Amino acid sequence: MGGYMLYFIINEKSKSGNAKQIWKEIEEVLKVRNVSYQAFVSEYRGHAGKLATEICAMDDNDICLVAVGGDGTANEVINGITDFEKVRFGVIPTGSGNDLARGLSLSKDPKNGAIHILNAMKKSREDTWCMDLGEVSLGDKKRLFAISAGIGLDALVCKKALKSTIKDILNKIRLGKLTYLVLTVQSLFTMQTADAELFFDQEKGLQKKRMIFTAAMNFKAEGGGVPMAPAASACDGKLSFCETAGIPK
C-alpha cells in the first residue's frame, strides 16, 4: 500500500455510540483487502490527540492516520500530529455536524470512505491534497483548527453541544446536524454581547459594538452545514471572516 502504515483513531461514542458498529463495517473492508493496520480507541476528551502524538513517535516512516469520528475527534487528531511531512491524514465521518468531511466532499458512507482512503494510499506523495490549517494563539499556547475558530455565539454553541442531551436525542433519529441550529436559536436570545476591537494584519482596529460573534473560517460552513463564508477555501492560504454585531437579538 504505497509504503504507508495505516493507523485508525476511533471515537466509538460518536453517532450516539453507533460508531462502534460503523468501525466493525470498516474493519470488514480492511480484512477483505488484506490491509495491515492498527486501531486505537479514544476513551475520553483529548485522548485522540494524545494517541496521534504517540503514533507519530512510534513510526519513523510515512504513515496514514485516519480519524473515525466527528469534527471534534478530527480536530484533536490534527493537533496531535507532530510531523505533517510524514503523515497523510484521512477522515471517516461519524459525527453530528461533519463539516470537515462535507467541506472535503467525502463520502457519507463509511465503507466507501475506507475504500477511498485505501485507493489514495496507492498514489504517490505528489498526489496528496494539501489543506490549510488555522492557528489560534493565547499567550504561549497554540492550537490548530481545520474548520473554523470563533468567539461569541458560535463558540458558546459548540461548548453547549459538548454536554447537550439534545445532541444525543437528535443523533438517534438521524437529525444530529440540527443540534447546532437548536442551540443557536436557544443561545441567541440569552447570551450577553460585548464590545470588541478587531485587528487584521496590523491595520487600525475595527470597533464593534455589541458583538454577537466573529468566526475565522477555513471552510465554507460550520455548525452542521451553515454557510458562514461561501467564498472560503481551505487551499488558498487565507482565512475568511464572518462577524455580526450591533443588531437587536
Positions of the model-derived regions?
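ATP/NTP phosphate-donor binding region
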Residues: 1-65, 75, 79, 115-116
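Glycine-rich beta-strand-to-loop/alpha-helix junction loops that act as flexible
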Residues: 12, 68-70, 92-94
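Short amphipathic alpha-helical segments
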Residues: 20-22, 77-81, 102-104, 227-228
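Short, solvent-exposed amphipathic alpha-helical segments in soluble enzyme
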Residues: 23-26, 82, 162-163, 230-233
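Catalytic core of DAGKc-family lipid kinases
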Residues: 33, 83-90, 94-212
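Short glycine/serine/threonine-rich phosphate/pyrophosphate-binding segments
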Residues: 48, 72-77, 99, 131
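Internal anion-binding site segments
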Residues: 200-205, 209-249
